[in-house]
Amino acid sequence: MNKILFVCARFPWPLLTGDALRAYNQIKVLSEKNVVDVFSVEKPFASQCDINKYLNVSSSGKITKLRKIYNILSHSKDTALQCAMYYDQQSWQELRKLIITNKYNIVIFQLVRLEYLIQKMVNLRNELNLDIKIYCDFVDALSLNMRNRATTESFFMKKLCQSESQKLTLIE
């Protein structure tokens, strides 16, 4: 039985988005033969009800909307907007403590927007010589979605989508 940490931007409950539904179902299946903890960068905004029966522990960062805006303004030149939003050192410190304390076998990151945390996790694994498998579940190639979207958008959005596509291609 593996000890798995599932890392997501938003807590996967309530099931209001496709990302939440995917995460919920992944956690449900993983919990059948593994111990699953969840770390979400954003605090849950609803009672966790049904998902709790599949989780060992859940914890979250405390990133605020204001902080996400600041992160976008500070980091969007370096990375895609969706990724820049979650450049959060405080969340990384909380996640780092969890990883070191709980000795996970597997860490799963959901979605490319967690690029910052993924890079930090890889560095931590290498620095501390941790025996942890790291999986990145990117669903699909968001870079291709942005490139395709650029073909149908007006001038400003076309340029933004093209830029996002290029940045995401490098990340993916």
Where are these regions (language model features)?
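N-terminal subdomain of nucleotide-sugar transferases
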Residues: M1-S58, I100-N102
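Histidine-centered beta-alpha loop that forms part of the nucleotide-sugar donor binding/catalytic region
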Residues: A9, V112, F138-A141
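Short, conserved loop/helix-junction motifs that constitute active-site signature segments
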Residues: L30-S31, L124-L130
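A conserved catalytic-core segment of Leloir-type glycosyltransferases
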Residues: V38-L98
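Short, charged/polar "capping" segments at the starts of alpha-helices
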Residues: P44-D50, Y116-I118, L144
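Short, hinge-like loop/turn segments at secondary-structure boundaries
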Residues: Y54-V57, R125-N126, T151-F155
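Acceptor-binding helix/loop patch of EC 2.4 sugar-transfer enzymes
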Residues: L66-M85, Y135-L170
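Short N-terminal targeting/anchoring amphipathic segment
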Residues: L95-Y116, D131-Y135
